[in-house]
Amino acid sequence: FVQFHPTGMVWPPSVKGTLITEGVRGEGGVLKNSDGERFMFDNIPEMFQGEYAETEEEATRWVNAVVADERPDARRPPELLTRDVVARAIRREVRAGRGSPHGGVFLDIASKRSPEAIKRKLPSMYHQFKELANVDITTDPMEVGPTCHYTMGGVRVDPDSQETSVPGLFAAGEVAGGMHGANRLGGNSLSDLIVFGKRAGEYAAQHAKDREAMSDVDAEEVERQAETMLAPFHREQGENPYTIHEDLRLMMQDKVGIVRTEEDLVEALEALTALRERAATVRIGGNIGFNPGWHLALDLENMLDISEAVTRSALMRQESRGAHTREDYPDTDDVTWGKQNLVTRQAEDGSVEVRAEPLPEMPEELKELIKD
């Protein structure tokens, strides 16, 4: 489950994907297509019908009340629907040919708030667009589009200690399989980090304290790993890692992005195989002293592993749930998939293996908390 934030910068290319805070929409910013239409009113899912404003007048009343720190007597604007809903709606407008010049939509705060109010309430956004895109958001709309934001899955950890399946290795936060299920709510990542980061730190400290001695280090294995890491410096021919990284990014966005199909996912797996072959022969220059190209060359293997794990899991999960949307399986299947987790691991032959495992039974103390 990969979450896409609905509003990231789409232009210029050097800053594509840079996040635009939801505060812009909270302050009254509206999403419009190239025809000037507020399309979110036409994209309220059935499950949210009745909970969001159905007219611009009602949406404006809600914003004005909130900005004035008053209790609103109206429903919130549909621009504030969950991230997956807004991201899919933007994608739909772009694919229908109603997108902005650079492949996004327009986020307009200029027509809703005075320049003084925008600079006072959204100073970082004002400076971000002024400096990075030469756009004055007090007079002109922003071009925005969905950007990859958060991974809900992660490595398997013990829920109490946060220890992974590797003894002595602890994990917390986005890297760990956590509490967010298929769709994280905004702000919950911070709570996750505070609670489980504290646990991980405490148990890691206790683990270190209880150890009597360090394990012996295999010198030959260290040498082999060093040779592998330094190999890109010694190749006479090979591709630039930045080229492969960009091709990987574009392919995953296109084939394994906001909306997925079996055809696209199968094509993505074929593309990943080809990208792995290219990544195995990357060549870099310079030396080991602060060399971003070398860092990227080393990261590519991890990026490819994660990309394949996400793709294979998305192909296996024949339903739509949270941030995972299958166009060919649009419904949520609680009977089959509501009771299973998908677990990826490295098979004996080195390939990525995916299998379904039943959800563990909820501990009694948690059941009691839910009752209360």
Identify the residue ranges that each predicted region occupies.
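Short beta-alpha connecting loops at secondary-structure transitions
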Residues: 12-17, 76, 180-189, 227-234, ...
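A glycine-rich phosphate-binding loop feature that marks nucleotide/adenosyl-phosphate handling sites
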Residues: 2-12, 143-151, 213-230, 323-335
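Active-site and channel-lining beta-strand-loop segments
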Residues: 28-41, 147, 153-162
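A conserved FAD-binding loop/helix module that cradles the flavin
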Residues: 117, 166, 178-204
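C-terminal amphipathic alpha-helical interaction region
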Residues: 281-372
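An anion/pyrophosphate-binding glycine-rich loop and adjacent beta-alpha core
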Residues: 1-131, 203-209
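Long, amphipathic alpha-helical stalk/connector segments used for oligomerization, subunit docking
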Residues: 207-292
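FAD-binding beta-loop-beta segment adjacent to the flavin cofactor pocket
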Residues: 149-170, 175-176, 184
